[in-house]
Amino acid sequence: MKTLLLTLVVVTIVCLDLGYTKTCLISPSSTPQTCPQGQDTCFLKALCDKLCPIRGPVIEQGCAATCPEFRSNYRSLLCCTTDNCNH
């Protein structure tokens, strides 16, 4: 009985310690990566500069604690909170 109780305690501690980690697509490779603790928002930014008409927007993907603030040089900004949603 003590062995069963000890096993249950160890399993509970291990499960609680693992926690949940968010994964987001990260530029430039657009591969899923685990976000740092506390960064539970995925984002995708399309940035434009003077070369935008020639080469198109620069795409940035990553993790953030909150959705980045929209700026004037952004063509678009997507924020989401499910795994790998920033594609």
UniProtKB/Swiss-Prot annotation:
Postsynaptic neurotoxin that binds and inhibits neuronal nicotinic acetylcholine receptors (nAChR) with high affinity (IC(50)<100 nM). Is a selective, and slowly reversible antagonist of alpha-3/CHRNA3-containing and some alpha-4/CHRNA4-containing AChRs. It comes from Bungarus multicinctus (Many-banded krait). Pfam families: Toxin_cobra-type (PF21947). One of its GO terms (cellular component) is extracellular region. This is Kappa-5-bungarotoxin. Keywords: Acetylcholine receptor inhibiting toxin, Disulfide bond, Ion channel impairing toxin, Neurotoxin, Postsynaptic neurotoxin, Secreted, Signal, Toxin. Expressed by the venom gland. The keyword Phosphoprotein does not apply. It is found in: Secreted. Belongs to the three-finger toxin family. Long-chain subfamily. Kappa-neurotoxin sub-subfamily.
